[in-house]
Amino acid sequence: MMFRLTSVSCFLLVIACLNLFQVVLTSRCFPPGIYCTPYLPCCWGICCDTCRNVCHLRFGKRATFQE
């Protein structure tokens, strides 16, 4: 009976650790100057191909407005 209780406890502990690692790994973010996407967000600031405080307007023939 003691062996079964220990095995179940270890199994539950492993599941809890895996859930914790999943939360830590999926909630990562990137500092300024690093490439970003909507799926790989910036820690602070906004994503304009790279993490920045402010997006600048691009001038020229193919100017685009970025929020």
Curated annotation (Swiss-Prot):
Residues cleaved off as propeptide: 63-67
GO molecular function terms noted in the UniProt entry: potassium channel regulator activity; toxin activity
Phenylalanine amide sites (modified residues): F59
Keyword Signal: yes
Major location (coarse): secreted
A GO CC annotation given for this chain: extracellular region
Similarity-based family: Belongs to the conotoxin I2 superfamily.
Name used for this protein in its record: Kappa-conotoxin-like 2
